[in-house]
Every structure is written in C-alpha cells, then in structure tokens.
C-alpha cells in the first residue's frame, strides 16, 4: 500500500482535502500573526487504495488515508515573534472513543502529540509526544486525540489505518484552540513545547 502514498496522484475515494493556513486559524497559537492565509499546510487523501486492494479493504471494513504535511513554519507564536509554530494537522478525537488508529511514516520525520481526557475535555489526564521516522508505526490508543506535526524542512507523508465507520471529532480542538501543547521553534532551531492556556489543566508532557 505504501507505493500509492508516494504517487503524485494517489487513488482516493473522494477529492483530496486541503487545509489552508486560514482554515487552520482556530487551532493556531496566534492566528492573526500568520501571513499567507491561502497557503496549503496539509492535504489528506481519504479512502486511498490500489485497485487490487479494494476488496480486502472493504471486506475488513477499514480505511486507508494518506496525509502530506508541507514544510514551512506557521508564523510567530507570540507578538514578539521569537518562536514560530511548527506545521501540523488540525487535531481530532474519534467517534466512537473506543476506536484505535494506526499511523505509519512513509517519508520524513513526524511528531505525534496524543492527549486524553476523562469527563471534561478542558482537563487533560494524559499527554504524550511520540517521534517516528520513515517506516516506523505508532498506535493511537482508544480515547486519545492526536495532532501530527512536521518538525523538518521537508515534506512529511503519513499513512493511517482506521475503521471505516469511525468519524473524526474536531470540535474540542477547535473550541480550545488546538492541542494542549503548541510545538514551536526558537531562534536556535530548538523545539519548544508551549502549554495551551485555554485548557484548565495540562499535565507534564511525557516523551515516549
């Protein structure tokens, strides 16, 4: 399946979705400071498959998606313009919450920020950072939301498997202006983890 992720025009079940900087504004640390609002940050091909794999995918009731996160920082994270936010996906939980998602890095290097709440989405109980390189896989356990981040200066291509009936739930990421941490880069090129103060409680980030 990985070969279709590297094609210029992979076979999608529908039209590829594109997220511009303007569309990402609800989850950026400082959206009003971000220039070039029509720039495409990432694009998703949902339900991708090769013709010979369609029956297998259908019989197992699963879906294969491809996500490309383009390089390029998203603008300063503060008015002082010291740190710049890293390119990322919007972030989502799953409906139903019991769903499990598997990601594989096709090319590039990824940082996955996964977080979990119990009753109140403003109170995060667990948050982890998982780094993965080419050909490495991660599993998003039930109940966790995920944001995928591209820390490099090159394109990041991800593939994921998810149940066909599972829906992405974006509402709490939008309401709380992103994940519970923002990943930014300082002038030295170091990655900085800034807490999102729209959450009532954020635990210490655990790096796996």
Enumerate the language-model features and the residues they cover.
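Active-site region of the double-stranded beta-helix
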Residues: 1-132, 150-208
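Histidine-centered metal-chelating micro-motifs
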Residues: 136-138, 142-147
């Amino acid at each position: 399946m990985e070969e279709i992720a590297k094609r210029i025009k992979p076979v999608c079940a529908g039209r590829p979705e594109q997220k511009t900087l303007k569309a990402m504004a609800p989850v950026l640390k400082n959206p009003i400071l971000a220039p070039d609002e029509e720039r495409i940050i990432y694009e998703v091909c949902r339900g991708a498959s090769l013709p010979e794999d369609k029956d297998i995918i259908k019989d197992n009731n699963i879906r294969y998606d491809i996500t490309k996160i383009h390089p390029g920082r998203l603008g300063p994270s503060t008015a002082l313009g010291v740190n710049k936010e890293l390119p990322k996906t919007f972030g989502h939980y799953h409906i139903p919450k019991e769903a499990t998602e598997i990601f594989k890095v096709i090319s590039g290097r990824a940082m996955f920020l996964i977080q979990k709440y119990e009753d109140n989405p403003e109170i995060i109980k667990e948050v982890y950072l998982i780094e993965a390189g080419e050909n490495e896989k991660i599993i998003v356990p039930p109940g966790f939301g995920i944001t995928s981040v591209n820390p490099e200066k090159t394109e990041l291509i991800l593939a994921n498997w998810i149940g066909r009936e599972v829906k992405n739930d974006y509402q709490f990421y939008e309401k709380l202006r992103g994940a519970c941490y923002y990943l930014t880069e300082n002038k030295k090129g170091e990655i900085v983890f800034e807490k999102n103060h729209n959450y009532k409680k954020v635990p210490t980030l655990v790096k796996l």
